[in-house]
Amino acid sequence: MILDEPLKLTQAKSLIREILKSGEVIYSKPHAEERLRKWNLTTVDCVNVLRGGAVAEGEYENGSWRYKVYTPRICVVVRFESDNMLQIVTAWRET
């Protein structure tokens, strides 16, 4: 677990990119998987949002810090499991 959360926006974005490059991305089961189906999103859509989206301030919810990463069309919520693993908690299409 990352001990110095909440991360600054630049730190969160850098860590997300580093994890995408050399870490592991996991999906909350069953919630994230259900949301991807509901909103007709793919894992590639989520990775693309994580690569190029903006990061919002962290929010503390259900015992962990969560970060919204968003584009005008899609929002993905992540939490950091460790310095080299993030979990996609949920995702949706902006309407």
Regions found by a protein language model. Name each.
Residues 1-95:
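Ribonuclease/tRNase effector modules and their secretory precursors
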